[in-house]
Amino acid sequence: MNDLPQAWTAVEGARVEERWQSPKPAGLKARLKDFLRSRMLALPFPVMKGMTARQALAFSSALRHPSRTPDQSRSLAGRFSSQAQGLVLDIPKEALAVFDAFLPASIRGLRHPRKLSPMARPRVRAASILLYEDARYRQELARWRGRGGRLLCVQHGGNYGQMRRICAMEMVEYTQHAFATWGWTAYDSALGAASGQGNFLPLPHPQLARQRDSWRRTSDDMIFVGTEMPTVAYQLDSHPTPAQFIQYREDKQWFLEALGPEVRRHTLYRPYFKVPGTLEDAEWIIPRFPQVRLCQGPLGPQILGCRLLCLDHHGTTLLEAMAAGIPTLCYWNPSFWPVSSGFGDLLGDMAALGMWHASAEFCAEKVREVWDDPAAWWNSAPVQAVRRRFLAHFALLPDGPSEDKAWLDCLRSL
């Protein structure tokens, strides 16, 4: 408090506390839904985002055989530990008490088997992204691995292959027997060659395949999509820091201001969904720009008919927009969002054509430039050539009418 200017007065406000818990299913309908969910997760290939139940059953059938290749899983202790990396970390054992105190009740309540019987003929099963959220499901997968089974993890959205560092995914998903990507084939580990390389399998994902070239303009609206703004960093990755997210939010203001009143009148803003401990989003934007309307309801159908899409971050929506052929402009501060070398090269090509900008104001200037006919600019030969390169690297689409054959062939070979 002593560092404040003399004219300032500091007042300590009331403590703000949010508690988010996963309620136990109550009632017959909820219990039935929970049971069906557990049965779905028990499939060799559970239903994943963007995939149908029919595909999950077909892909599960393709994984019924014993594994046909040597196990390519990487040991965390053997590849990522301080000993494996040649580091000396003298952390006192007393520090473990801190970790124990923060251990979630969902994990603390688990009971682990003392012994696991090995599989006679190890098989591969695909892991749902729920392995990050469901402690019991995660334990089930750990038992599978403990018995010698192999895991296939599957990319479920953006950032994979694009962020320079994505430590949780690197250690949890990339270390498994195989990882199905949306097109990319390599990742430069933060720990270098000593940590090894993942078994990356580029496959056309159904979530993107269904949207292939599906954009048809039906409105005069530009949709401006934002992302989560956490005030506490909850994993080590190449996202902005909490302080940088404050500037990220300020950039939204400069972007909307630079659009001018005519474009703002046609602008819809799409905030990220509510997450505990994040900055105010729409509550901060809309009062500053009353002309801007809130984009509500399912996002997919709206962007498939919009006049122009603008993104202030890279993520799943960018990949879907490229697959669907939506006229899209992007901006973000590259020092806030460090990217992989492959994505960085592609951003250079996108910047040369005005598809991506390093500042909010320059992006707004491009919006005004193409506003009369965004589709004419988007469908120009140079822009479409870069779009095709983007799709080949980060949003792979099937060669034929269906993506199923590529998946079935791959799964049968594992």
Place the predicted regions along the sequence by residue.
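Catalytic-core helical/loop segments in enzymes performing group transfer/polymerization on anionic/lipid-linked
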Residues: 1-414
